Amino acid sequence: MKTLAPSYLKHQFLIAMPHMADPNFAQTLTYIVEHNANGAMGLVVNRPQELNLADILEQLRPDEEPPASTLQVPIYQGGPVQTDRGFVLHSSECSYQATVELQGLSLSTSQDVLFAIAEGVGPQKSLITLGYAGWEAGQLEAELADNAWLNCPFDPDIIFGLASEQRLGAAAASLGINLSLLTSQAGHA
């Protein structure tokens, strides 16, 4: 008997189904950074906080005035795990102290990327989050089987080219789906 290799969702989007009850993930679009037999990690990319980069820089360097441009750089709620830890998803033309390459995209977790963005010498495209979404081994697969999520191919234009409130709908539309027309009820033929 042939066994199938597991299918993992690294470098894809997760679209929260309209009936998602968990307030951490209701109406979210999540980029999957890693997914393997040990579990999954993702970053919610459509939920801005009231914080901006200037607020973060004031905490990191209290003796320095952040550049005015940093007031316009939003900070996103990346997920409910380690909400005091920063993650920067960005274009790959720059690398920093703690950078991981993700198939044409990079993820940095060191402060130097924040300072580079503030100084105008950082990556051309970036999204900054505090916290991340984490799933134990088999947990995400179970949630997918329960129809809590849809997955779709990653598209950098959705993260970097659209306003945060447009991202979820655009990801669903890439599958030809209008989320407002979906129901949580499953039928059987």
Curated annotation (Swiss-Prot):
<comment type="similarity">
    <text>Belongs to the UPF0301 (AlgH) family.</text>
</comment>
<dbReference type="Pfam" id="PF02622">
    <property type="entry name" value="DUF179"/>
</dbReference>
<dbReference type="InterPro" id="IPR003774">
    <property type="entry name" value="AlgH-like"/>
</dbReference>
<protein>
    <recommendedName>
        <fullName>UPF0301 protein PputW619_0469</fullName>
    </recommendedName>
</protein>
<dbReference type="GO" id="GO:0005829">
    <property type="term" value="C:cytosol"/>
</dbReference>
